[in-house]
Amino acid sequence: GSELPVSTLTDEILTPGEGQIRGLVSIAGNPVSSTPGGHRLDEALGGLDFMVAIDIYVNETTRHADVILPPTGPLEREHYDLIFHTLAVRNTARWSPALFEKPDDARHDWEVARDLALALIRARGEKPSVVDQGRFRVPPRMIVDGLLRVGPVRGGVKKVAKRPGGIDLGPLESVLPDRLQTPTKRIDLAHEVPMSAVAELADHLDVGPIRLAPDELLLIGRRHQRDNNSWLHNAPRLTKGRARHQLLVHPDDLAKRGIVDGDEVSVRSASGQIVVECAASEDMMRGVVSLPHGYGHGRKAGVRMRHAVTLPGASINDLTDPSRTEQVSANGVLNGVPVTLAPGPPGPPA
């Protein structure tokens, strides 16, 4: 398969012609909140021919789905961590069994994806290949078991499951260059694609800081430890305490604009505008403002996240511009967005 930067998704949906996206499968995601120009993507999703979501939440994105297929909850399925092992400083293994039996009519997310794939194959009048049939019958537990047996655990899931606290296999050990699949067993750091960008980097550095109009500020994002992703806002324990939704602004920048701490302000960029509460903070550099990721759940009709919709705040990605991308990967630029700040709600667009 292949992939494209999500910053192109809105245009791929809205641009007519061959290859236009008319259907979408969303799996445990909320791109309306998490991608540049989220308000434009929100409008584009409403024009799809069909959308299906595998999700436990009706959020800003899945509210557009024709069908929502909720998988089992996190305590109804077994778990072996993969992502956070990439951040580990020691070699560990831990198998977490399901705490509760899943209801008879419930399916795990991998089962939902499998059954959708089978249904699509049959709808095309085709039959699954022998390879596909074999893959579809293998549950994640069997895959993890096989990988553990060829690794340092040498005992599979059954051995790891006997140790609820996990197994510490000691400090990390280098596996290079053996794991490299290149003919020379070396990593080519001078590939033509990044090197072409490096050649132009000096030109960008010579330009100096981003040129701003006299009344413009630079917007940057931030994430908090307890609610760093949008879906965590639906957990009261993770959002309790001091409010964290505000736009942080240096006191001098507020004073220049006749704004005081706690005021509602209008923030406008080249691609959108929002209204949000501001907070004076000397932690911010003059000329820079900061808004946290993932807020603004209450601004969209149809969002059914009981706690999240009660939280104040606005989405930073209603201000980011999907046309501003990094040259090599084409991923969106999420920081350093020029914005203007004014008291009160926004006026009509310029």
Describe the role of every protein-language-model region.
Residues G1-R63, G73-I83, N91, K159-R257:
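Extended redox/cofactor-interaction regions of prokaryotic respiratory oxidoreductases
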Residues D66:
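Catalytic, metal-anchored helix/loop core of enzyme active sites in primary metabolism
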Residues P71-T72, E282:
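Electropositive
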Residues L75-K102, V112, A117:
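Glycine/threonine-rich phosphate-binding loop and adjacent beta-strand/alpha-helix elements that clamp
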Residues P97-K159, S230-L248, D252-A350:
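Long, contiguous, secondary-structure-rich segments that constitute the structural scaffold
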